[in-house]
């Protein structure tokens, strides 16, 4: 749980009374919108009903770090100045559309190369004579694979939605690879924070308890 204090430091492991013990980490200054210190410090705290052991400390901190990474992935990505919510559902939808558009694009290119006289045409007009002898001009499918694009995605928030229509595979590819690059960057940042977290200070504290 995120807490605030005007103190310049906190006890990382502290008895609260009634058998409760506080575990604290991520102590840092609270900043305003301009990035200036406010005189208040933030820290994370989890309360135990016993002295937390080092494996419990690692589990609590790791779970928090995972939540931080998940939150950054969910709501931290912006594309062309639009907020993109990267929920698991949205990630799946973006991947499905990208994969289908990529495969279809290759199939269309191959079909057009084999049928240069019909390239770019999903239908052609043909004259058909009915049983009554009437001639009708109707569209007839050529067999060319159907285009996936254009496709529209909803970005922004429910209160301020923004819609973007993708007309080309190149733009869709740029969007999707940007999403994947951002997600991978979030994971790498999370791994770095996990690897650099110093648990030795907690181990030393526990020795004296």
Sequence positions of predicted segments:
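A preference for well-ordered globular domain cores
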Residues: 2-209
């Amino acid at each position: 749980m995120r807490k605030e204090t005007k103190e310049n430091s906190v006890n990382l492991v502290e008895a609260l009374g009634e058998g409760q013990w506080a575990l604290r980490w991520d102590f840092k200054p609270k900043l305003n919108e301009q990035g200036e210190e406010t005189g208040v410090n933030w820290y994370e705290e989890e309360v135990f009903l016993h002295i937390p052991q080092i494996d419990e400390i690692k589990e609590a901190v790791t779970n928090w770090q995972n939540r931080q990474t998940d939150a950054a992935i969910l709501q931290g990505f912006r594309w062309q100045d639009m907020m993109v919510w990267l929920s698991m559902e949205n990630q799946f939808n973006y991947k499905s559309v990208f994969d289908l558009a990529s495969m279809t694009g290759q199939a269309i290119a191959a079909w057009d190369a084999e049928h240069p006289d019909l390239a770019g045409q999903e239908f052609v007009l043909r004259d058909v004579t009915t049983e009554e002898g009437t001639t009708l001009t109707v569209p007839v499918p050529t067999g060319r694979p159907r285009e996936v694009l254009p496709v529209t995605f909803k970005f922004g928030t429910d209160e301020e939605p923004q819609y973007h229509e993708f007309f080309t595979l190149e733009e869709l590819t740029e969007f999707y690879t940007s999403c994947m690059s951002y997600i991978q960057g979030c994971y790498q940042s999370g791994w770095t924070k996990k690897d650099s977290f110093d648990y030795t200070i907690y181990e030393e504290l526990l020795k004296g308890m």
